């Protein structure tokens, strides 16, 4: 399959790209222009055979339609402005990320994708003093959590309107190579 991936150099993104390539898929990794983390996608110092790197701002994902000749099957949207701790409370940055995600859905349709997969966050649920699962009521406690939940609701609706399958991967505490030393797992 041909898979477009935003957020490809993020902690989760690098692992996802590696796994997709290992499974024989062609990956179109969308990176910020002059990304300082582009080398995370290299294998043995080289760009893997089935990997195409495309530099594009998250706010301009529609430009991919004119830049890509290949038909794409899946759009994996992990890119997000303001995912870092200092920006999670900035409602303006978070709203821009919501609009980026909805434009990513439209771009996915224009590229011929059948599926759109978005990575959500435990922040959608807010704080609960009980065991959590997908049935628990969402009560986000930050602009970041509110924005991720807004994308889940609006992108799913937009995908239905555009006849795209929608997938929502709500990510809770991940860990592994390259994890931040201040992450939940690393500090336990």
Enumerate the language-model features and the residues they cover:
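Conserved catalytic-core motifs of eukaryotic protein kinase domains, centered on the activation segment
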Residues: 40, 85-92, 127-131, 180
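Active-site helix of classical SDR
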Residues: 147
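NAD(P)-dependent short-chain dehydrogenase/reductase
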Residues: 153-188
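Conserved Rossmann-fold NAD(P)-dependent oxidoreductase catalytic core, especially the SDR/UDP-sugar
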Residues: 77, 81, 102-143
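Conserved cofactor-binding/catalytic machinery of classical short-chain dehydrogenase/reductase
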Residues: 60, 74, 100-103, 115, ...
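Conserved glycine-rich Rossmann-like NAD(P)H-binding loop of the short-chain dehydrogenase/reductase
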Residues: 25-36
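NAD(P)H-binding glycine-rich loop region in Rossmannoid oxidoreductase-like domains
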Residues: 52-96
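N-terminal Rossmann NAD(P)H-binding glycine-rich loop of SDR-like oxidoreductase domains
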Residues: 3-23
